[in-house]
Swiss-Prot record:
Superkingdom of origin organism: Bacteria
Family per similarity comment: Belongs to the bacterial flagellin family.
Protein name per UniProt: Flagellin D
Alphabetical UniProt keywords: Bacterial flagellum, Coiled coil, Secreted
InterPro entries for the chain: Flagellin, Flagellin_C, Flagellin_C_sub2, Flagellin_hook_IN_motif, Flagellin_N
Subunit structure: Heteromer of multiple flagellin subunits including FlaA, FlaB, FlaC, FlaD and FlaE.
Chain's role: Flagellin is the subunit protein which polymerizes to form the filaments of bacterial flagella. FlaD is not essential for flagellar synthesis and motility.
Note: V.cholerae is able to differentially regulate the flagellins within the flagellum maybe to produce flagella which are particularly suited for motility within a given environment.
GO molecular function: structural molecule activity
Localisation per UniProt entry: Secreted; Bacterial flagellum
Coiled-coil spans in chain: 103-129, 310-339
Length: 377
């Protein structure tokens, strides 16, 4: 083998392997210290792009879960307040039934009305003050808002919160009263025992309901018969013997038309709008009508509470799905980008050994040209 002084090929070879081992060692240290096997585009350009897209999706899913939880919190806040609204309406109904009893004097009914007025004020206070993050929930101003429960645009769900004030038309309906009162001697006559209600239901469908009373029935029995034949309207009788018909806005849209022989005998008058805000139990007739008004309001509140319950259940399922997606997205991102510590530790040990070996060989290779000096000896 030739002895060269100007060119030390062995040293150059050792230097090349040392550089490679050092670079590999630095790469392993970077991966182990950062926890990522992709730290720049040069490590894996395609993998970096995919992992970044997955990271964006994961962050979006995290935000979507927070949004969904906010939606649940709003629904829970509203539904909790509406639970108290239900309690108030139930108490008002109890008081109305109490006032309708004939054992009460005028002064006692006035006292009952005072409590109903106070309860009505509290019902409205709850509707006006229930809020979440500064947004009023139950006074009609919340209306409909969207909740972003997905990682991409367009993945939103709408939530509607209805007006729970007592003067809301859906917290009542329309009252119709017969022009003439019927005393205890009045009876349903043969050939004039039918009354037909023509109306539109809440979905806008035409409804025609015919009730045939029995010959000889008195006015109280007529009211009982109507209530037994249909739930679209509620019938009662006031202290003057006048038939009262109430159509709740949660069931009937628009006015009710009356026809038939019995309707002609009763001579039903034009309707008057009534809500929980306007109920008056200082008379028997008013107390009877109040029960129907409050029943309509209770159905309205209960229906909306059911909607909020369904909304909460839907969002709970949405959160479970988002968590599942996020788990799989992060698992995929981890497989692409995260460091395999067992594998990388092995690579680091290998590069350290090669680095040490290359350094030792390089030191020996640098001594080779000294052999030329011995020839000059």
């Amino acid at each position: 083998m030739a002895v060269n002084v100007n060119t030390n090929v062995a040293a150059m070879t050792a230097q090349r392997y040392l550089t490679g081992a050092t670079n590999a060692q630095q790469t392993s240290m970077e991966r182990l210290s950062s926890g990522f096997k992709i730290n720049s585009a040069k490590d894996d350009a395609a993998g970096l792009q995919i992992s970044n897209r997955l990271n964006v999706q994961s962050r979006g899913l995290d935000v979507a879960v927070r949004n969904a939880n906010d939606g649940i919190s709003i629904a829970q806040t509203a539904e909790g307040a509406m639970n108290e609204t239900t309690n108030i309406l139930q108490r008002m109904r109890d008081l109305s039934l109490q006032s309708a009893n004939g054992s009460n004097s005028k002064s006692e009914r006035v006292a009952i009305q005072e409590e109903i007025t106070a309860l009505n004020d509290e019902l409205n206070r709850i509707a006006e003050t229930t809020s979440f993050g500064g947004n009023k929930l139950l006074n009609g101003t919340f209306s409909t808002k969207s909740f972003q429960i997905g990682a991409d645009n367009g993945e939103a769900v709408m939530l509607t919160l209805k007006d729970m004030r007592s003067d809301n038309r859906m917290m009542g309906g329309t009252s119709y009263v017969a022009a003439e009162g019927k005393d205890k001697d009045w009876k349903v006559q043969a050939g004039a025992n039918d009354i037909t209600f023509t109306l539109k239901d809440i979905d806008g469908n035409d409804q025609t309901i015919t009730v045939n009373a029995k010959e000889g029935d008195d006015i109280e029995e007529v009211a009982t018969y109507i209530n037994g034949q249909t739930d679209m309207v509620k019938a009662s009788v006031n202290e003057k013997g006048q038939l009262q018909i109430f159509a709740g806005n949660n069931k009937v849209t628009g006015d009710v038309a009356f026809s038939g022989g019995l309707a002609g005998a009763l001579n039903m008058q034009a309707g008057t709008a009534e809500t929980v805000d306007t109920i008056d139990v200082t008379s028997v007739g008013g107390a009877q009508q109040s029960v129907a008004v409050i029943d309509s309001a209770l159905k309205y509140v209960d229906s909306h509470r059911a909607e909020l319950g369904a909304f909460q259940n839907r969002f709970n399922h949405a959160i479970s799905n988002l968590d599942n997606i996020n788990e799989n997205v992060n698992a995929s991102k981890s497989r692409i980008k995260d460091t395999d510590f067992a594998k990388e530790t092995t690579a680091l040990t290998k590069s350290q050994i090669l680095s040490q070996a290359s350094s030792s060989v390089l030191a020996q290779a640098k001594q080779a040209p000294n052999a030329a000096l011995s020839l000059l000896g």
